[in-house]
Design a protein with these regions (language model features):
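Internal glycine-rich alpha/beta core junctions
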Residues: 1-170
Length: 170
């Protein structure tokens, strides 16, 4: 299974990968909720256009809906960049023959992993909740599917080390 006395080091290597994966999971659920909310906002007709006063406009034309969608889109793009950096560092550290460069990548990765786990999972809950809000009352019922995304993403800040407690790793 490994060398004697190295179990804790092996476990933390596994935890890095697990935390990276959970961060990606939090992001992925929020991304799916965003995609659904965007499609819904384009087809759901309600109210009038504030700019020209026309009736029966898609809710994506309403400023508050646009604000929520833009928050989701921008946050998801930033999260994606962060976890892709962590994934690239993981691969680099595993394959780099230069000991100095490998250790440098491992140090950066050690710093990033708690962030990669906590930020996309905490915000995954927030962003998915925005998707429910965009759906309005329909978002609360099972038929929309978005209520399930909220339940699915809610566990991600908790498992593989609760975000508040693992923040001590920073």
């Amino acid at each position: 299974v490994g060398r004697a006395g190295k179990g804790l080091a092996y476990m933390f290597t596994m935890m890095k990968t697990a935390r990276l994966n959970v961060g990606i999971e939090g992001h992925a659920v929020a991304e799916r909720a965003y995609q659904n909310a965007l499609a819904y906002a384009k087809e759901r007709v309600q109210g009038r256009d504030e700019a020209d006063g026309s009736d029966d406009v898609a809710i994506i034309r309403h400023p508050d809906v646009r604000r929520m969608l833009l928050i989701q889109k921008a946050t998801l793009a930033a999260q994606r960049a962060l976890y892709l950096r962590a994934a690239a560092l993981t691969d680099f550290a595993a394959a780099c023959p230069d000991n100095v460069l490998r250790k440098e990548a491992e140090r950066e990765l050690d710093f990033l992993i708690p962030i990669v786990k906590a930020w996309p999972t905490d915000n995954g809950v927030v962003l998915t909740n925005l998707a429910v809000q965009i759906y309005g009352g329909a978002g609360y019922v099972e038929e929309s599917g978005v209520a399930q995304y909220l339940r699915d993403v809610r566990i991600t800040p908790i498992y593989e080390g609760t975000n508040g407690i693992q923040a001590a790793d920073l």
